[in-house]
């Protein structure tokens, strides 16, 4: 039985994303985040999602060549427009910038709007923790769950 190594999983996912039109750097960053989810035991946000992303790219629901556009840029606050791109590489870039700004300013918040699914959020916070920072990541999505005792999805 063939075995899938971490390296080969990243290479294959990167290749599939590139074939769908995603530039190499963004494709590899996305692939690394996806595979990291599986390595962390969060399979619901790992490689099983790749066919969904590829289908959305093919259907035009995700912009393969999206560019982060700066909406607001203050010392401790940056807001990007994600241009309907893949959330993984966009959140990775946002987390890196938040870390850099927090190291200089003591605190920082970076937001990305008009993006897509970004996978497991802990992937973006872990590098912050390794730098001695407190990181918080959150995301929005459609109302799909009822709160306990509720009658309307929030």
Model features per residue range: what roles?
Residues 1-20:
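Generic N-terminal amphipathic, Lys/Arg-enriched alpha-helix
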Residues 18-21, 36, 40-43:
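N-terminal and secondary-structure boundary signal
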Residues 22-29, 44-46:
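Flexible, glycine/charged-enriched surface loops at secondary-structure junctions
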Residues 46-101:
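Active-site cofactor/substrate anionic-group-binding motifs, chiefly glycine-
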Residues 70-73, 102-104, 129, 152-154:
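Solvent-exposed alpha-helices and their adjacent loops that cap or buttress functional pockets
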Residues 79-83, 108-113:
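Short glycine-rich or small-residue beta-strand-to-loop segments that form or flank ligand, phosphate
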Residues 109-154:
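Glycine-rich anion/phosphate-binding loop at the beta-strand->alpha-helix junction
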